[in-house]
């Protein structure tokens, strides 16, 4: 059933179509990798891995909190709601991200899929996956450190990253964070024609997703399912934002700014 809003608002179906288009863009890379049959193996170029590591760190605590605050502030500026509506939007944005992370944790605990680097540890260092995950998190990190102490083909920063990230793989929490923000951009900012912001968010989210694959943290299916969950949550969050905070379409004054921006871009 389509939930209709005020005359100035969009219905749920229109919002879902828009965010689905964004989700489809994000799914291109992981689906292509999945279909290709690519499997992660250690030994990639250290400089390239370091770049990917810093991309993934934009989502990892504490940097992820800073990213969240910056994006919230930018969205509030772009939408230019009044104070009460802005505070409500801030709560909706934060709620969408937190609920997504909660869903991720629940699914991880029930599916219990091992990370690619843990599967590799079993093959290369004879560390059984079941025994690894039966350990407490602190002990898992210590085991990774011990087993890879002499593994010079794996950069030190990546070994430390693995020591911290010893949880289950499915779905990808980093992907859910980045994909949620990218899709919130599509859902909330497209009516304001913030195309540059949307493009940057989509590229950034795809970069985060790729980094999770190449750092040995996730399988392609982890990224696909995380993106689909994000799409569902963001579609609802966008609909709530318009219903509670007001129409996403710009007022007449801002329409003039958009027209001027479009002319300068052309």
Can you name each region flagged by the protein language model?
Residues 11-13, 140-266:
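Membrane-embedded catalytic cores of phosphoryl/pyrophosphoryl-handling enzymes
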């Amino acid at each position: 059933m389509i939930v209709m809003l005020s005359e100035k608002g969009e219905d749920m179906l229109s919002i879902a179509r828009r965010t689905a288009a964004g989700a489809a863009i994000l799914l291109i890379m992981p689906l292509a990798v999945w279909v290709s049959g690519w499997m992660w193996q250690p030994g990639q170029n250290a400089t390239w891995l370091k770049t990917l590591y810093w991309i993934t760190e934009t989502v990892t605590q504490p940097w992820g909190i800073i990213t969240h605050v910056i994006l919230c502030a930018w969205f509030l500026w772009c939408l230019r709601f009044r104070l009460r509506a802005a505070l409500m939007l801030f709560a909706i944005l934060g709620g969408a991200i937190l609920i997504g992370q909660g869903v991720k944790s629940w699914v991880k605990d029930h599916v219990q899929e091992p990370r690619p680097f843990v599967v590799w540890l079993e093959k290369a260092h004879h560390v059984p996956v079941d025994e690894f995950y039966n350990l407490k998190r602190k002990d898992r990190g210590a085991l990774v450190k011990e087993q890879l102490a002499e593994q010079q083909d794996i950069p030190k920063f990546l070994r430390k990253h693995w020591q911290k990230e010893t949880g289950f793989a499915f779905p990808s929490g980093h992907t859910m964070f980045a994909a949620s923000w990218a899709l919130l951009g599509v859902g909330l900012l497209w009516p304001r024609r913030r195309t540059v912001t949307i493009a940057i968010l989509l590229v950034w989210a795809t970069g985060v997703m790729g980094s999770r694959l190449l750092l040995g943290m996730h399988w392609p299916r982890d990224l696909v399912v995380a993106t689909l969950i994000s799409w569902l949550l963001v579609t609802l969050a966008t609909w709530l934002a318009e219903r509670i905070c007001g129409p996403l379409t710009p007022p007449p004054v801002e329409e003039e700014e958009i027209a001027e921006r479009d002319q300068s871009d052309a």
